[in-house]
């Protein structure tokens, strides 16, 4: 979960609220959706193809960036490559094929333009009767004499599972077993999972609208809440927002977040929210408990408590060295690997717990009790 602590004069802290939520909510949402799709692909490459369906230019550019962090191997948004170094990739358009007098002529011309990166779109007219046969002819007549091999073909419509099986057989028989098949057309993690289960002969997926808009879950509900006030003497006064909905009761105080790892397998056990000055002693057993159902407890030993947050600004100056984009991608992948499969599965996943330390839980309950007392008075 994203967590940011802003400690600033009240007016300044309020001014950054909207922009922080805009950036964090949107890109966290897209990165999460991308990661689900990538995991569904089971090692097959996934490219982000969604710019045309994004909700504005910034959503396309930053959404593509987030998709890469989530695990996509490329994007059709070229400016994202220019700005962040995320690999730009893509294939031909249907309009390219339509502009020529014949599909074969369109394919042969494209092969001449991109002999080392040829991916032909074979569904403009008929995948099996013209698209794949003409692609094979173009490979034979243009690429083969040049000593080049095709990268692949793309199928963008129809029963892709069925068509990919037939296309794979045709390509193999023509001497192109290394020619990859890319599938696109309103895909998401569920469709990709089903296609693979049904035996689709697909090597790559181009995922557009359902990724760039996170169609299945289009809102990420991150919030920005006042947690404490510091007076002129430096005393911190925890603040709480109370709601009839238990889930919307905020957790007070300036906080520090630890991620607790099991040293035996380096799997994440839970996250632990603490008061900002708390230090976890790794030499002693640690009791984790559900902050709402406190009788649910777990005592762990042989663990590592890793502080998650890093300071970005201090006294108005940036003190953080921004990591290279590829390092952000690697970090995200490594953290996902620390989660149990039961947590990352699509149906009925286990809850990943964010617990409170005993000290923070006591602060929260004190403020709740104090509010009840004042209300009763």
Question: Locations of the language-model features?
Answer:
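Gly/Ser/Thr/Ala-enriched C-terminal appendages of enzymes
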Residues: 169-174, 179, 187-377
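Short hydrophobic alpha-helical runs that function as membrane-insertion/retention elements
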Residues: 4-5, 90, 182, 203-206
């Amino acid at each position: 979960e994203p967590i940011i602590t802003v400690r600033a004069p009240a007016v300044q802290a309020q001014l950054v609220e909207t922009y922080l939520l805009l950036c964090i909510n949107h890109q966290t949402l897209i990165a999460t959706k991308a990661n689900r799709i990538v995991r569904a692909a089971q090692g097959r490459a996934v490219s982000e193809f969604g710019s045309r369906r994004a909700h504005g230019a910034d959503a396309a550019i930053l959404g593509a960036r987030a998709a890469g962090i989530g695990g996509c191997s490329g994007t059709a948004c070229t400016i994202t490559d220019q700005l962040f170094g995320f690999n730009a990739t893509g294939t031909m358009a249907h309009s390219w094929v339509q502009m020529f007098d014949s599909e074969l002529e369109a394919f042969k011309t494209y092969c001449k333009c991109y002999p080392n990166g040829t991916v032909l779109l074979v569904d403009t007219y008929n995948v099996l009767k013209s698209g794949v046969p003409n692609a094979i002819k173009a490979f034979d007549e243009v690429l083969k004499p040049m000593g080049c091999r095709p990268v692949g073909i793309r199928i963008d419509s129809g029963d892709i599972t069925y068509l990919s099986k037939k296309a794979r057989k045709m390509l193999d028989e023509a001497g192109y077993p290394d020619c990859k098949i890319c599938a696109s057309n309103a895909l998401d993690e569920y469709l990709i999972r089903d296609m693979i289960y049904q035996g689709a002969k697909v090597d790559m997926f181009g995922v557009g609208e359902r990724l760039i808009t996170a169609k299945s879950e289009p809102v990420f509900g991150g919030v920005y809440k006042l947690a404490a006030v510091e007076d002129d003497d430096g005393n911190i006064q925890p603040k709480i927002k109370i709601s009839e909905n238990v889930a919307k009761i905020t957790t007070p105080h300036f906080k520090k977040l630890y991620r607790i790892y099991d040293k035996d397998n380096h799997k994440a056990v839970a996250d632990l929210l603490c008061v900002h000055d708390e230090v976890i002693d790794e030499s002693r057993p640690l009791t984790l408990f559900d902050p709402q159902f406190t009788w649910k407890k777990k005592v762990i030993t042989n663990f590592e408590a890793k502080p998650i947050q890093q300071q970005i600004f201090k006294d108005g100056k940036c003190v953080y060295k921004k990591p290279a984009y590829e390092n952000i991608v690697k970090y995200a992948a490594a953290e996902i690997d620390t989660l149990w499969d039961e947590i990352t599965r699509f149906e009925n996943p286990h809850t990943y717990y964010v617990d409170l330390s005993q000290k923070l839980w006591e602060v929260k309950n004190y403020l709740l009790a104090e509010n009840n007392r004042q209300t009763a008075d």
